[in-house]
Each structure stands twice: as C-alpha cells, then as structure tokens.
Amino acid sequence: MLDGVNLIIYGAAVSAISFFGVLFLTPAAIRSLTAKRKVVPDAHKAEKPPVPRPAGPVIMISIAAAEIVLFVLTMNIAILAILLTTAIAFIVGYIDDSRVMPGWFKPVALLAAAVPLVVLDVLHMGEVYGESLNLIFGRAYIPLLYMPLIFVIIPVAGNTINSIDVLNGVASGFLIIAVIPLLASIAI
C-alpha cells in the first residue's frame, strides 16, 4: 500500500506521462493519418472539416506508458491487471470502430477484458481487488460476488462510455465528473 506522499508523487508522474504522451504524439498522428487519407468529416461542426481518425492508439500508448512506469515503480500486480484490461478493451474498441461488426460483438468481446482482473487476482490471492469492497458507508465482504460482477461491469461500462460519446469531448468530461466522487470515496 502506498503512503499519501508517494500516492501523490506517483499520481502526478503518471498523469504527466499520459498528458505529455498525448501532447507530443498527437501532432505526429495527425500528420500520419492525414497523409494516409484516414480522415472523416467532423459531423459536429457546421463546416464539417476533415478530422483524422482514429485517435485511440495515441491515447492507448500514453496510458500504457504511464501504467508500465507505475507498475515498475510499485510492482503492484493490480496495475498490471489494469494495463492488460485496458489494452484488451482498446483492441476490442479498435476492431469495433474499424470494421462493421454485429451488435453483439463488443459486449461479448469485452468479457475478455475482465479476464486479467479475475485471473491475476486468483493467481496472486486477493492482490488485484482485495478481500472486500470499500464503500462510502463501510466495507462489504462478498467475495463470491466480485468475479461475476467484474464480468458484468466491464462490458456495461465499455458500452456506456461508447453510447455517451455523442459529441467531441462529452465522454472525457463525463468521466471526469464521475471519477471525482469515486476518488473521494476511495480516499475516505
């Protein structure tokens, strides 16, 4: 477990890695995607300017770099589980965005993203998500519920984010609003 000072230092470090990764990789990605004519009209602007896509690889590379650094610093198996879950969810989303897939594909494929969380927790005896849920009103100890709940939460969360991302930036703004109370409850 990290103490408060290291938590802040590591949090600032991984945030900086993610931020600067996106900041520096995005211009190169824009040039590359534009040169390859991988652009689509921006449906949310009146003049419909061409926008390069996909931006997901830049975001994933930046998140993965930050998570790898955090794992190396802490050697916390939960970070590795989060990295693998994020990578699998990214691959599923990338496939879903680049090809026309049937409606059932994404929710079913996102079940694979839950596997690292469950398998690494079983292999490392409670180091990934622990023995109890830390809730605002106290702790709940229901270990048999955690595994099936993870297999429900990952596909539901993935599809929810996909469905609320109707305008540029809506998903990121919504996630910031949703994460603030979550972080507060974890800190308490």
Stretches found by the model and what they are:
Residues L2-I188:
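"…together with the soluble PPM/PP2C metallo-phosphatase catalytic core" -> "…together
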